[in-house]
Amino acid sequence: MAHKKAGGSTRNGRDSESKRLGVKRFGGQNVLAGNILVRQRGTHFHAGENVGLGKDHTLFAKADGQVVFERKGPRNRRYVSVRTVQ
């Protein structure tokens, strides 16, 4: 009779799905209201003018316009704004 010794168990073999975080629309790009600008965990980027903040800290455009990234304030925070075109 052919025999094969039992293989040992392993504790590996798991991994979580990637969450596809990051900047989705870059500076200078034209966007429509509702477009997602940044997906993030926490406020790595802050909401500037014409930008909303979702409950999962997603930044989205509130108006049509052009994306602008800037640093402001005493803490030099990064803000994402949408400048509307008149």
Swiss-Prot record:
GO molecular function, one term: structural constituent of ribosome
Domain of life: Bacteria
Gene3D superfamilies: 2.40.50.100
Classification via SUPFAM superfamilies: Ribosomal L27 protein-like
A Gene Ontology term for the protein's cellular component: cytosolic large ribosomal subunit
Keyword terms, alphabetized: Ribonucleoprotein, Ribosomal protein
Keyword Ribosomal protein: yes
Region (Disordered): 1-23
InterPro entries per the UniProt record, alphabetical: Ribosomal_bL27, Ribosomal_bL27_CS
Gene Ontology annotations of biological process type: translation
Stored Pfam families: Ribosomal_L27
PANTHER family membership: LARGE RIBOSOMAL SUBUNIT PROTEIN BL27M, RIBOSOMAL PROTEIN L27
Similarity annotation: Belongs to the bacterial ribosomal protein bL27 family.
Name of the protein in its database record: Large ribosomal subunit protein bL27
The species this protein was found in: Alkalilimnicola ehrlichii (strain ATCC BAA-1101 / DSM 17681 / MLHE-1)
Name of the gene this protein is made from: rpmA
